[in-house]
Amino acid sequence: MWESLTHGWNGLAMAWLLVAVPLWVSFSQGNAAIRQWVLSPVIALAILFGAGLCVSVLQASLNAGTVMDAAIVLVCFPLAGYFGGRYLTRSSAGNDIHKRGTRLREDTEHRRSSTRLDGGHAGQLTLAGVGVPPEDETKHFKLIGTTGTGKSTAIRELITGALDRGDRAIFADPDGGYRARFYDASRGDVILNPFDPASVKWDLFAEITNPYDVEQLANALIPAGDEGPGREWRGYARTFVTAVTRRCKQSGTHDLAELWRLLTAASSEDLLPIVTGTPAQPFLESNSAKMLSNIRSVTGSALSALEYIPAQNAAPFSVREWVRNGRGVLFIPYQAAQIAALRGLIAAWMRIAIFEAMSRPEGDQRLWFVVDELDALGNIDGLKDALARLRKFGGRCVLGFQSISQVSSTYGPGEAHTIVENCGNSLILRCSASEGGGTSRFASQLIGDREVVRAEVSHGRSHPAFLSRGGSSVSNSVTHRHVTEAAVMASQIEQLPDLTGFLKLASDPAWTRIVLTHR
């Protein structure tokens, strides 16, 4: 049977198919202009002739029998077709040759390599369908994209795997979307929002177990913010809150309503005995009435949500105690109408939790901090430094934002860029432009530039002189040019469809084009 297949027209047809099919496959995977020749027999015939010579030499040198003949033919011809096509598409005009800088790969290519390298690692998380190496988890995640592009979809995919393997998490949860998806009372999950009937009641005084905890609490409630005239007044307000809160704790007055009254409404006569002998005493001097009024204005604005907590009828709750000994997930849900009142308090709770996580013994005690709208929340004081240190204590941060300018407005340009740099895993979805480039320009710069060698083909046609013999002739020339360009232009990022973007994991040198799927 083998003899009948390999002789005459049957043999030629089989050899042609063994070369041509892999050749066409390799063409379809390339991006070169040579695709237009895919139906031409010239290339396949040339490869077929070369492969035939190699097969003849191998058969003669091995003195092969029928079975070996079949093996040589069935292996050599397809390999010659496939790799010949890959070489042609790689080297042809219209296909850039990467020299250095940012590399981009297709989603399917990365999925194949991830599967090959990780082999279905038990408990491995995925982001956009791509496996996240365990060592990358503690290098934190940033997700950049405008509304509706898929940030929440990506976070749900990532956190679903984390919770399935027993990790704990804290969500700053816009509109309660993560609560609706993940809440499980049997797991010990907790809701924290003074406006939510299902919420526990935050006990501010339970966060104070050491003398220095008062300063930490004041810093969380009234962050320093960026440089400017307001920074000094926030410093005065922290000094005032620290002094009054410490005296209340020392005297056993653990009544949040009374603390709120002292901070915002008590007379100078009531306050003076409390702050005497503290750094806040000068604020109560007779010639400092206007200064005290300004300090109270800053304090009341920053701590406004504390006014609503005493009215709750719920079990007392400590964020620090939950980080040390709690179970499940802590949800901090908020509605759009509540954000003005809760912004500072949510940021304070996240800050308390992050710094308590760094007070634990070093080790991989997996705890996720998820902030889906970093640019909508207030300043989480110390976030920049915490991102650099949390990994030693098992902390993993997932930060999503729409606008880099809004993050810069909240944290200051320098700190905002440090926060971005400290998140080693990046997912970029569609971003908006604004005057000066906006977030799309920032995202393009984040992906980076690349240098490529670009082959450019020029076509020419010459015509014979008048009355001369011969027809016109066609000439083609190829020139190679070194080009440095943005790997992904800002305008490309602005035009991305929903659920489509670019992913880079911390341990991977290349960016991957990805498509998210709803879960």
Predicted regions and their residues:
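Accessory regions of macromolecular translocation/handling assemblies
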Residues: M1-R187, Q250, A265, P273, ...
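P-loop NTPase motor domains
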Residues: P22, S92, D96, P134-E137, ...
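Conserved ATP-driven motor cores of ASCE-family P-loop NTPases powering translocation/secretion/packaging/pilus
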Residues: A206-P211, L387-A506
